[in-house]
Amino acid sequence: MSTLAAPTPSNPRWLFGPVSDLLFGCGIAYMGIFALMTVAAEQVEATVPITSFLLITLVIAAPHYGATLLRVYESREDRRAYTLFTIWITAGLIGIFVTSLYSPVLGSLWFTLYMTWSPWHYSGQNYGLAVLFLRRRGVTIEPRAKQLLYASFILSYAIVFVAFHTGVSSTGYGPALPQGDSYVFVPIGIPLYMANALYAGLGGLYLLTTAGTLFLLARGSNLRDLGPALVLIASQALWFAIPGLARASGTLQGIAPLSNLTAPYIGLWIAIAHCVQYLWVTTYYAARDENHVGRTRYLTKALLAGSAAWGVPALLFSPGLLGNVPYNMGLFMMVAATVNLHHFILDGAIWKLRDPRLAKILLRSDDSVGPRLDRGGSSFVRPLFWATGFVCLVIFVVGDLEAQYGVTRAGERGDAARIEKATRRLARIGRDSPKLHHQLALLAQRDGDLVRAETEFKAALEVYETKNVWHNLGTMYLSQQRFDEALHAFDEALALDPSLAQTRVHASTAALSLGQRELALDHLKAAARLAPNDRGLRRRIVELGGEPNPPGQALP
């Protein structure tokens, strides 16, 4: 087992050493990804496709969350010190999470808060590490320089904030893969003309504050002492300020990492860089303060703790247990939002350089800070917690592998048997989804097995009702001349989304076949209002004896 390489008094300038500190702590590793994307974006995306981030984030993001949990909950001393956060605020977050599963409005606002807060959290970490390196190297940071440095990081975040909240955001920052039909990002809705003015103002102020910071710091120090902080300032610019302004203005779109087209993909790399950076500093802190004897043991515990934090709510609140929203239709998003917001709040409470113990470890070079208090806890609680974390880790690995190989890739080659096997396995671990049964139903229809198709359509609806499943089930019934059942299916689809023009056309056909002429006409008129340029609909309305033009609509 490798031990943590704590700095000695002869090398107080680094935490682990120049290579790892610059690569992982300051962000040069991400700069390498940025450079690779610039010259070979297609090859990078082919080598590391976006679907692979499910497992990548498991390995890196889970211990990143787990490290915070260990920092706050493992020691009795810390549990007592942060009772407000560890008990009361945590309970409040759990309450919002549970409520959001039954309220799409609250869930959407919750997800929006998480996405909006994420770059602020990243920016705060970059700023804190920049100050840490300056102070470890004995650089005198006069108040004005510190204020300008802080303002520079805030302004770079503000650029992303405006991008998020101008209409529908497409900047793609944030560590989650947004997958779901129940929840959406809800932007404030900044008007475009106002956003353009804000971009110009924020961009100008960002350049001024950054230049002022560099000027004031350079007056009393040298490049060698300023190096790590300068790299962190550059990382912040590459993460937020430069891509935010480039995408907003439509400039530099030929550079892949700055393009709107690759924003979601590059945003995942930024999230990974942040998680690695966090693990880098927390691993150092744990070795010095919490007496962990080895890096491997500490990171394993962090991985299990993070896996439990993600896995337990996802399993308990899956459909069939305590929840009603499938994993890939909103539950994942709500778990991600809650776990991350909990992490953000705890981080804001525990990582303060004005904390004497924290400052002694991160800002000084002495090797010991005194013994920790007893961690306490029942003898059976800890093994149970680690076992739970291990089970959740296995569930994540199995779930992600089955989703990628048993569903996505099997679907590409039309392998219904493999998808069916994956569906059964995913259902056992709380990841049953109407999309899986819907896909099996469509494949059964393709093969002419309409009995099996109907079974899978109904299985999909038992998991979670969606407009697409109801529509396709109704279409199958219509082709079988089961008009009563078809009309019922179309009505259910329209109850979920009244704006489905094609569903209304099919419902009209079913109603007319049942002799319900007025109902058929009503559906056609509603479809014509949704598709005012469709002359075929108007002809059918006339054929049924209706008005040629829907009310309020003129012929083109």
What name fits each language-model region?
Residues R428-D432, Y464-E465, P498, P532:
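Short coil turns that delineate tetratricopeptide repeat
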Residues F390-A417:
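Hydrophobic alpha-helical transmembrane segments in integral membrane proteins
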Residues P434-K435, L450, K467-V469, F483, ...:
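Helix-start (N-cap) detector for alpha-helical repeat units in TPR-like alpha-solenoids
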Residues T408-G411, L442, T475, T509, ...:
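Residue-level recognition of tetratricopeptide repeat
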Residues R446, S479-Q480, S513-L514, E543-E547:
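Register position in tetratricopeptide repeats
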